[in-house]
Regions:
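Bacterial N-terminal signal peptides
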Residues: 6-15
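Exposed beta-sheet edge and beta->alpha loop/turn motif
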Residues: 105-136
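Positively charged n-region of N-terminal signal peptides that target proteins for export
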Residues: 1-4
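Short beta-strand edge/turn micro-motifs at domain boundaries
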Residues: 101, 125-154
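Short, low-complexity N-terminal intrinsically disordered segments enriched in polar/charged residues
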Residues: 17-53, 159-161
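A mature extracytoplasmic/lumenal domain signature
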Residues: 61, 94, 106-108, 147
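Hydrophobic pocket/interface hotspot
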Residues: 35, 46-48, 55, 72, ...
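A solvent-exposed, acidic/Ser-Thr-rich amphipathic alpha-helical stretch
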Residues: 27, 44-97
Length: 161
């Protein structure tokens, strides 16, 4: 009986000390759904809520990083200069710890110059992949993108398929 009680205590300690699921994962995934709204509406209030002020973002339109929610939205505005109807659709999302990987479908009509290519009027769509990193306050602090530029350039006819 003494051994049974000891075994039960050991099992309880093992269960209690095992890694608990990260509740932040669900919060980060919910934040990414709001992020989708932010980039499709260019809502600066949502940007302030979701993106840390010191988060760097990179774009071919700027030789230096852009920072914070406004910096991220400047990337959105840059895309809208060429694709006024641009939309991002969240297709897949995987989260672990403080990182969320998202596969987006980016689509829009090429109505303005894009990276030196004059407007073609063509509608294009491509998949892009981003990894978003969150801080302890639940804000995005970094975004690493697997650029879909080849898909965009093929879609507007700048590259052959």
């Amino acid at each position: 009986m003494k051994y049974l009680v000891s075994l039960c205590c050991a099992l309880l300690m093992l269960v209690a000390c095992s890694k608990q699921p990260d509740n932040n994962i669900e919060a980060h995934k919910a934040a990414m759904k709001r992020f989708e709204t932010m980039i499709n509406t260019a809502d600066s209030n949502i940007a302030k809520e979701l993106v840390a002020n010191n988060a760097p973002f990179y774009t071919p339109a700027s030789p230096t990083p852009l920072y914070g929610g406004e910096g991220y939205l400047s990337v959105v505005h840059w895309m809208r200069q060429s694709f006024p109807d641009v939309q991002w659709k969240l297709e897949d999302m995987v989260a672990e710890g403080n990182v969320v990987a998202v596969r987006w479908t980016l689509s829009g009509t090429h109505e303005g110059e894009f990276m030196g290519m004059p407007a073609t009027g063509k509608h294009c769509s491509t998949s892009v992949m981003n990894f978003y990193y969150f801080n302890d306050e639940g804000k995005v602090i970094n975004d690493i993108a697997a650029e879909g530029m080849i898909g965009i350039l093929r879609g507007i006819g700048a590259l052959e398929k």
